[in-house]
């Protein structure tokens, strides 16, 4: 299958009994469509901001998506999270969970477990 569209997501939901989280959502309309297709959560992410230069900032769309989906629908968030303050911002804007990627991976690659530990300390509140 060369394309993943909304019909594919609906069919996947029918076939998959486990939790289904859709990552890469950056618009209210897509988030509402994901919810309508039966996904268990939306993962707001720009995949590191390296896909489209003109894509909206994840933190900008997060509160809009939270408002549209309501207070109880699970929202995961990443993109541009570099310290504890960024985590607080995402939580205040409506995220239920904040995910980390590159900062920890880069630290692990540069200095092994010690580097990873130092990176995690940067995220302490």
What are these regions, as identified by a protein language model?
Residues 124-125:
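Extended, intrinsically disordered, low-complexity segments
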Residues 1-77, 84-107, 117, 121:
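Alpha/beta enzyme core
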Residues 113:
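Active-site-adjacent loop and "lid" segments of alpha/beta metabolic enzymes
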Residues 110:
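Active-site-proximal loop->helix
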